[in-house]
Amino acid sequence: MSKKLTFQEIILTLQQFWNDQGCMLMQAYDNEKGAGTMSPYTFLRAIGPEPWNAAYVEPSRRPADGRYGENPNRLYQHHQFQVVMKPSPSNIQELYLQSLELLGINPLEHDIRFVEDNWENPSTGSAGLGWEVWLDGMEITQFTYFQQVGGLPTQPVTAEVTYGLERLASYIQEVDSVYDIEWADGVKYGEIFTHPEYEHSKYSFEVSDQDLLLGNFERFEAEAKRCLDEHLVHPAYDYVLKCSHTFNLLDARGAVSVTERAGYIARIRNLARVVAKTFVAERKRLGYPLLDAETREKLLAEEGE
């Protein structure tokens, strides 16, 4: 019987595969976020006419999902392997199935289903056609063809593939609890993450200072607007991410009512939309540097008319 891949070997295998498909290997973005989609390597790069192919691991924090390290499948922080390709390759689903084969999952020997599940992220004004990928009855991946990001239509169409690494590793290693996953030879997932999960859960549900967080949200929102006034897209987006994480902490703590919740989401969405519009305008001002010369000249001429 062949040796099962460790968590980090799964990551290395996916990195090598998508590198071979022409993706740049980016690093995790250094701000808290609820999903890999919220990284600027996806959110910003999915809009505008320039091509973009990237793959990266993204630790994703969801305070309300924390379970003090006691639930085998619910986590404060999990890891996603994010692939984003623009324009979308026509064979991206076939490429995805090839990646599973490299992980030791033969599509001919397993029940692999693409279950329609259109995707929406209200806090960033983003949506797309999507499918959950189910492997023998367990969701392991989300496929999305973005239709809009930051309230802007995506042209060309961007494809996103988001692997849930903990679920994938649980399946490959045949364990019932994420804490039993072998991260590296001789080191279990739980030996690294159980106590941080407990501490972050305790903070999110019991200890966080609600007044501090409420004040932080206001300050982060104001700073994002100030950055946008100066056309500083990336600093502004950093503060949008901070607003989002602060809201998630408030939500986990039960500090916002249903009505207030909708208001906070709208405020984050409005900021994200301005960031998106400003980013596209800045890329145009720079002359769309990632486009080839012929396409760039043609597009700039058309937009200048």
From Swiss-Prot:
Presence of the UniProt keyword DNA-binding in the record: no
InterPro entries listed in its UniProt record: aa-tRNA-synth_II/BPL/LPL (IPR045864), Gly-tRNA-synth_heterodimer (IPR006194), Gly-tRNA_ligase_asu (IPR002310)
Highest taxon above the source species: Bacteria
One GO molecular-function entry: transferase activity
EC number(s) given by UniProt: 6.1.1.14
Gene Ontology biological process terms in this record: glycyl-tRNA aminoacylation
Keyword Cytoplasm: yes
Catalysed conversion reaction: tRNA(Gly) + glycine + ATP = glycyl-tRNA(Gly) + AMP + diphosphate
Keyword terms: Aminoacyl-tRNA synthetase, ATP-binding, Cytoplasm, Ligase, Nucleotide-binding, Protein biosynthesis
Top-level enzyme category: ligase
One term under GO cellular component: cytosol
Family from the record: Belongs to the class-II aminoacyl-tRNA synthetase family.
Protein name: Glycine--tRNA ligase alpha subunit
Gene of this entry: glyQ
